[in-house]
């Protein structure tokens, strides 16, 4: 429950009649004219118990100040009292009798007779019309917080606020969005994934030539043995030919030599042959390749035709050991 307190006009009359506040007196009680001490604290200095006691009493009456809880603020008390006096419709200031300068500055007010209900309505309607006309005449930049608060306080509002509704534009907004938004296909989400399988067929570049894969067989042990036997026979034949070559002893300047002349042996028995040395070639067997031919069974006439263009090597004497 809000605390009920006395309105400002009867409270002010009671304070004037009590004669407890210095400077607050009736000038003309019949015309309800009174004065209030209005000393400027910044210029003349204040005595709270003498110059600001009326403002402090009003702050205590309205509950804005409690002794011991808040620090005293005389300037704020005076400003709140002035605003309350200006808001009263049945009290007006007599400006031609007020003194605003000096240490004895006072303000003079007149209490008007109480207004009837019809007068109150007319006064409120007039104030609301004045506020509307001022709002139309003034541009937006000339508005002040005081003017806006005065217009709100002077305007009358009905007690029933149920008919105050905000117009809804949701339907129109939705229609505009539907017209502006292009039609989109519905998006469906499925939890199953398709099987990603691609058939792969390997086809050769040319289908005309198709061959079966074949592996060459390894040589048998018998074939390898025959190759080794042939190589052994060839070496034996060469050694026999070298052994059958006749070495003849001879002496040159008292020194003994062995002489081997080709063709000294009868051709009918051994046949003639030629031996040509080849340069050394690294081979897996590590032997010197010799080109030779067995001419035992060769015709002598054919042999002569083959050996005619061959230049015989020069014969060198081999010294014998003494």
Curated annotation (Swiss-Prot):
Example GO molecular function: DNA-binding transcription factor activity, RNA polymerase II-specific
DNA damage listed as a keyword: no
Cross-link (Glycyl lysine isopeptide (Lys-Gly) (interchain with G-Cter in SUMO)): 276, 296
DNA-binding region: 5-113
Pfam families in the record: IRF
Subunit field text: Monomer. Homodimer. Interacts with EP300. Interacts with MYD88. Interacts with PIAS3. Interacts with SPOP.
Function: Transcriptional regulator which displays a remarkable functional diversity in the regulation of cellular responses. Regulates transcription of IFN and IFN-inducible genes, host response to viral and bacterial infections, regulation of many genes expressed during hematopoiesis, inflammation, immune responses and cell proliferation and differentiation, regulation of the cell cycle and induction of growth arrest and programmed cell death following DNA damage.
Name the UniProt record assigns to this protein: Interferon regulatory factor 1
């Amino acid at each position: 429950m809000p605390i009920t307190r006395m309105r400002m006009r009867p409270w002010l009359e009671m304070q004037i009649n009590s004669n407890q506040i210095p400077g607050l007196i009736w000038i003309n009680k019949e015309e309800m004219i009174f004065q209030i001490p209005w000393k400027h604290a910044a210029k003349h200095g204040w005595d709270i118990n003498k110059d600001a006691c009326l403002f402090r009493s009003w702050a205590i009456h309205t509950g804005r100040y409690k002794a011991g809880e808040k620090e005293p603020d005389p300037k704020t008390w005076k400003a709140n009292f002035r605003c309350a006096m200006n808001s009263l419709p049945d009290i007006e200031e007599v400006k031609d009798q007020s003194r605003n300068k000096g240490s004895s500055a006072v303000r003079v007010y007149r209490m008007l007779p109480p207004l009837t209900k019809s007068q109150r309505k007319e006064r409120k309607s007039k104030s609301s019309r004045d506020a509307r006309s001022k709002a139309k005449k003034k541009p937006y930049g000339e508005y002040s917080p005081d003017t806006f608060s005065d217009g709100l306080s002077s305007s009358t509002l009905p007690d029933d606020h149920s008919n105050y509704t905000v117009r809804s534009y949701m339907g129109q907004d939705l229609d505009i969005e539907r017209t502006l938004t292009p039609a989109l296909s519905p998006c469906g989400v499925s939890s199953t994934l398709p099987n990603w399988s691609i058939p792969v067929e390997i086809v050769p570049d040319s289908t005309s030539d198709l061959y079966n894969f074949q592996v060459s067989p390894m040589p048998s042990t018998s074939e390898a043995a025959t190759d080794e036997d042939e190589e052994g026979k060839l070496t034996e034949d060469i050694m026999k030919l070298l052994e059958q070559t006749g070495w003849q002893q001879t002496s040159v300047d008292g020194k003994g030599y062995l002489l081997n002349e080709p063709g000294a042996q009868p051709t009918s028995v051994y046949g003639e042959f030629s031996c040509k040395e080849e340069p050394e070639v690294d081979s897996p067997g590590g032997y010197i390749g010799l080109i030779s031919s067995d001419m035992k069974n060769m015709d002598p006439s054919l042999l002569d035709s083959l050996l005619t263009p061959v230049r015989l090597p020069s014969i060198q004497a081999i010294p014998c050991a003494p």
